Amino acid sequence: MGKIFFFVLMIAIIGSTFLIEEALGSLVGCPRPNFLPSWNRCKCICKNNKPMCRKLPNLLKTTA
């Protein structure tokens, strides 16, 4: 029971951060990131109106 709840919680956290990043990206005018898993895709950073990519750390390795 606890493992199922933890798994659902992790999905909710990852999904919410994905939505927040999408909203912030559209506000600052960054292009949409590719639909890869949230922990493995590029994070959009705008510098001088040029999008830059930074890999996010793998969250699954820390939780596993």
From Swiss-Prot:
Compartments reported by the entry: Secreted
Family: Belongs to the ant myrmeciitoxin-01 family.
UniProt keyword annotations, A-Z: Disulfide bond, Secreted, Signal, Toxin
Maturation and modification: Contains 2 intrachain disulfide bonds (per chain) and 1 interchain disulfide bond.
Residues making up the signal peptide according to the UniProt record: 1-25
Oligomeric form and interacting partners: Homodimer; disulfide-linked.
Entry function: May have antimicrobial properties, like most ant linear peptides.
GO molecular function list: toxin activity
Main location as per UniProt: secreted
Name used for this protein in its record: U-myrmeciitoxin(01)-Mg4b
Tissue expression as described in the entry: Expressed by the venom gland.
Note: Not detected in the venom.
Transmembrane portions of the chain: none
Lineage: Eukaryota, Metazoa, Ecdysozoa, Arthropoda, Hexapoda
Organism: Myrmecia gulosa (Red bulldog ant)
Cellular component per GO, a single term: extracellular region
